[in-house]
Amino acid sequence: MATYSVHLASPAEYKEAIALRIHVFVEIQKFPLDEEIDSYDPLAQHFVITHAERANKVVGTLRVYTVGDEAKIGRVAVLPEYQGQGLGKRLVEHLEMHLQQDAAFRQCKEAKLGSQYDKRVFYEKCGFVARGDIYDELGCPHIYMYKAINHIE
């Protein structure tokens, strides 16, 4: 059975995470490179899931930062060859535990993300609920999804 670890990215893992995002969002999904790396990256906490049997290769990533009383989740990506194994869900669940416990997110009442519309079922399986209308982001339909953060005192 494969061994995976979910954790905050080290500086080296952050570089791998950026390369993974470019592969998934730019090379595969054809989003513009100049939109992928943005002004939120330096503000965000970046999480990765690594595969121990592959020299701790980064196989998935996401980022989170605060906007008012929301934890904004974004850039959720898993390498195609690792999709369908529950790794994205593990990444999101780990982030949820982090949001419940980290003082930096204490003011956040809920987590918010902009899901590609055709990926919304994944987030529904993670407990997120769609709110609002479908909107266009870079030519791709998206919808905002939310989940309450139950802080651990």
Which role fits each region the language model picked out?
Residues 92, 99-116:
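Conserved GNAT acetyl-CoA-binding A-motif
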Residues 66-74, 83, 105-107, 138-141:
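A conserved beta-turn-beta hairpin within the catalytic core of GNAT-like acetyltransferases
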Residues 112, 124, 129-144:
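Conserved catalytic-core motifs of GNAT/GCN5-like acyltransferases
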